Amino acid sequence: DLHAVTTAFKTLYPGKWISTGISKGGQTSLLYRVFFPDDVDVSVPYVAPLCYAREDGRHEPFLRRVGTEADRKKIEDFQLEVLKRKARLLPRFEKMCTEKNYTFRAPLEEIYDFCVLEYSFSIWQWGTDIRSIPETSASDDTLLDHLLAISGPSYFIVDSPTLSFFVQAARELGYYGYDIAPFK
C-alpha cells in the first residue's frame, strides 16, 4: 500500500515527494495520484498504458500511422528481412540465449518471431532513430545485433522481473496485439 508507506516515510523525509514509473509502474504512479492526490508533490508516469481490452487493438492502427510512410516501410522491410534470414540467424540467436541462461515457455523459434513482431512497437516506444535501422543488405550479424538491441528475447524469459505484470495483463489489464498480416 503506497499510501501507508508514504505516510510512514514522511515522518523521516518531510521534503517534497515524487512518484514515477514506466509501464505498470506508470499506471501505479497515475492511479496513486488519483486515489491519494495529496501524498506526493509530483507524479511522472513515463508510460502508463490503460488498455481497453485483453487485446487492446489501438496499437496496431497507431503503428500504421506513426512516423512517415518511409519510416514505416523501413521498419517493415527490416522485419521481413530478419524473418527471411531466420534459418541463418536462429543459431546465433540460440547461442546468445544459451549464454545468458534464458529459458522460455515457448519454443525458441516462436520467441524469435515474437522479437520480430515486438520490434515495430519497441522502436517507437524507446525513441530509436529510424536512421539506425540497418539496410536489408547488411550482414547477418548487423541485422541480428540491431534486432536484439531493440527487441531482444529477455522480454519473454521465464524468470522475467516483469512476469507478474504479464500475468496481470493477460487476466485483467490487457495488452497490445501484433499485426501479423504483413508477415504471412
In which residue ranges do the predicted regions lie?
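Alpha/beta-hydrolase active-site loop
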Residues: 1-12
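Alpha/beta-hydrolase fold nucleophile elbow
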Residues: 13-23
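Structural recognition of the beta-strand scaffold that forms the well-ordered cores
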Residues: 18-20, 42-45, 169-171
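Glycine-rich nucleophile elbow surrounding the catalytic serine of serine-hydrolase chemistry
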Residues: 21-31
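Short, flexible loop/turn elements at secondary-structure junctions
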Residues: 23-24, 47-50, 174
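A catalytic-pocket lid/entrance helix-loop region that shapes and gates access to the active site
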Residues: 38-100
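Alpha/beta-hydrolase fold active-site neighborhood
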Residues: 95-184
